[in-house]
């Protein structure tokens, strides 16, 4: 069955028919196409375009189609053709009435919005699960000291929990972005027709409410040609993957023998086909790698849309693969990341030792001098020279004796050793959001 053809004298070429078909991709939208068709039939009944009896036939047939299983994907043009073809096979000419006051243009946009809305809720749930795991880990490793880094060089002492909670903030923003995007996803375009609306008295608001949409689109041309909601989702997904990738990069580094801060479980690691000793952090590496794939999907759709005149163009058929692939990739990465973190072990002692040998208390020594009345820039220079001296002696700053300190600055007294204590440094942090020692209450 074709949904078009009366105007044509010649049969479509076989290669063109295959080229034009999207059923292998958009079959995923089948349940949404059926639900949207049910709501559309309700709208046709309300407008007295079909009778109560005809509606009941259509409803019964659509619900039967929803329960059917396919051993292989039918050879039809697209998911809309499939549903209408099966409907006609079941109830004859009554089934042909389903497309009254509707175009595939508003139909596909509706299906995609319903699909994406559903998937966004699933992704939000996964992000919330991830944040629960991160918060639990931060409680477990509260006050476990580690180096904080800038330029991948040891910078200042922080706690492992504070580092984990940095990612909680990122994922909270991601959740907020997804929730906000639902305002633009959850808009019904049914009734926009091909591009100009319809002369049938369809109650668009009523049909939208049946499908759980919050509002209807206000311009029929925009309704069928808009794919901003997909581009926006792909942008948000790219940000989420960026956050996962940054964390994955750290886990790859931390799990190396050079760092040895963490060890991934056997469940989330793989081995080498040639080197028997290897334990590779492939879970983190694959997440890092798949980030580029999601970025590519965003760029793909942006490129597809950038030159399209209004309204619908067949180019827009290419929106589904980047959308579906991004949804699948993002969900599996989140699931694997959650499992990886849950089973990861942390080498607290190794982190603590890394703080000791890195002069991470140098900034606090400079602040100590400022409190003694020395301008910060001068204090910075004095401490820099002290660090250089300690490096030549191959000792931490806090192991210098007081006379050595006074060789660089007479303002340094015995209380400097309290200031240089890492735990005291963490306790001294006062600003909101600082990496500080958490006292037990």
Curated annotation (Swiss-Prot):
GO terms for biological process: arginine biosynthetic process via ornithine; L-arginine biosynthetic process. It is found in: Cytoplasm. It catalyses: 2-(N(omega)-L-arginino)succinate = fumarate + L-arginine. Its EC number is 4.3.2.1. GO terms for molecular function: argininosuccinate lyase activity. Pathway: Amino-acid biosynthesis; L-arginine biosynthesis; L-arginine from L-ornithine and carbamoyl phosphate: step 3/3. InterPro entries: Arg_succ_lyase_C (IPR029419), Argininosuccinate_lyase (IPR009049), Fumarase/histidase_N (IPR024083), Fumarate_lyase_CS (IPR020557), Fumarate_lyase_fam (IPR000362), Fumarate_lyase_N (IPR022761), L-Aspartase-like (IPR008948). CDD domains: Argininosuccinate_lyase. One of its GO terms (cellular component) is cytosol. The keyword Disulfide bond does not apply. Keywords: Amino-acid biosynthesis, Arginine biosynthesis, Cytoplasm, Lyase. HAMAP family: Arg_succ_lyase. Belongs to the lyase 1 family. Argininosuccinate lyase subfamily. This is Argininosuccinate lyase. It comes from Petrotoga mobilis (strain DSM 10674 / SJ95). The gene is argH.
